[in-house]
Amino acid sequence: MKLGVNIDHVATLRNARGTSYPDPLKAAEIAIDAGADFITVHLREDRRHIRDEDVFNLKKSISTELNLEIAATEEMLEIAKKVKPYSISIVPEKREELTTEGGLDIVNMHSKLSSIIEEMHSSSIKVSLFIDPNIDQLKYLEKLGTKPDIIEIHTGDYCDNPSEKKLQLITNAAEYVNKLGIECHAGHGITYEHAKKMTRIPHISALNIGHYLISEAVFYGLHSVVKTMKMTMSN
């Protein structure tokens, strides 16, 4: 199972004082050296953490794949076409939220998402959609004219208040996505304990983890916590 390390909150710390440090690129390099399989950043419309120049620097400099999380807006899609990351992940976005609060509403967005996927594929960019583990939403993937390359299952509800029932919803969602022939990732709120459970779910091929790793890095160092997470996932 692959580990994608989200380094947004390195930029949050930098922006808190308006300094040039800590540098997200340095964090990415450390994470990669410790075993991260790819790097994820979320370029939000309000630029509250990652900025445009961070994304371009990362694409130019890192040795692994870059996954760029963005909202489904014309501005962000144009930036993606200029950056040309390995993949983009379309996420819902509200200015007032502290973090992404849920998955995309595919029921009401399937035609828009189809055109976005087609547009990105024409620029050789893979597309991931961030979706709740809700089969009623996932069924609408079959209505998409062009299929996404990846579905990332939103694990926040489970991670905030774990239960076997919620874990089963994630398991069922991953199985459904796999039957459609789409790669399945998972992310949001994942800790070491959650990761142990996620690695037992068939069909999930990668986890995206950010806030927890950066928080633990304050006490134990980024290299150490990324390495520990990789070991946790491989066990």
UniProtKB/Swiss-Prot annotation:
Output the Gene3D superfamilies linked to this UniProt entry: Aldolase class I
Entry keywords, A to Z: Cytoplasm, Pyridoxine biosynthesis, Transferase
EC number in record: 2.6.99.2
Q: Residues that bind 1-deoxy-D-xylulose 5-phosphate, according to the entry?
A: 8-9, 44, 49, 99
Binding sites annotated in the UniProt record for 3-amino-2-oxopropyl phosphate = 6, 17, 189, 210-211
Tell me one GO biological process term: pyridoxine biosynthetic process
Molecular functions (GO terms): pyridoxine 5'-phosphate synthase activity
Summarize the protein's role.
Answer: Catalyzes the complicated ring closure reaction between the two acyclic compounds 1-deoxy-D-xylulose-5-phosphate (DXP) and 3-amino-2-oxopropyl phosphate (1-amino-acetone-3-phosphate or AAP) to form pyridoxine 5'-phosphate (PNP) and inorganic phosphate.
Q: Which HAMAP family match?
A: PdxJ
UniProt lists the family membership as follows:
Belongs to the PNP synthase family.
The protein here is known as Pyridoxine 5'-phosphate synthase
Q: Which organism is it from?
A: Wolbachia sp. subsp. Drosophila simulans (strain wRi)
In the UniProt record, what gene is named as encoding this protein?
pdxJ
